[in-house]
């Protein structure tokens, strides 16, 4: 499953990207780093279930494919918590994380 690591940005792209972005991104990444058939099935399933995460469909014939999707209001109200790294601060409950073997402190 190491070949899927190149496709992680696909899951991090905001839902407001135009419709034509997803197939172009997939084709360019497949041309660059060809995943194994098993990982291609997993990647296809992840992209198809992407519609479950957003309030709009993946593709619709009711609008132009070059128009951007409406940004979900839940993210606007949450202060773009998914876009920034403040969710790590919320999850850890700390302002900084200390890594002793590196003698480094990461401030969130």
From Swiss-Prot:
It holds the Pfam family BC10. This is Uncharacterized protein C652.01. It is found in: Membrane. Disulfide bonds: none annotated. It comes from the Eukaryota. It is a single-pass membrane protein. The chain crosses the membrane at residues 7-27. The keyword Hydrolase does not apply. One of its GO terms (cellular component) is membrane. Keywords: Membrane, Transmembrane, Transmembrane helix.
């Amino acid at each position: 499953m190491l070949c899927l690591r190149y496709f992680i940005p696909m899951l991090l792209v905001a839902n407001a990207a135009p419709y034509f972005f997803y197939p172009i991104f997939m084709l360019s990444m497949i041309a660059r780093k060809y995943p194994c058939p098993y990982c291609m099935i997993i990647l296809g399933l992840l992209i198809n279930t992407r519609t479950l995460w957003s309030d709009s469909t993946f593709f619709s014939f009711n609008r132009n494919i070059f128009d951007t999707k409406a940004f979900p209001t839940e993210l606007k109200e949450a202060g773009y918590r998914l876009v920034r790294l403040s969710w790590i601060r919320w999850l850890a409950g700390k302002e900084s994380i200390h890594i002793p073997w590196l003698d480094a402190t990461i401030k969130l």
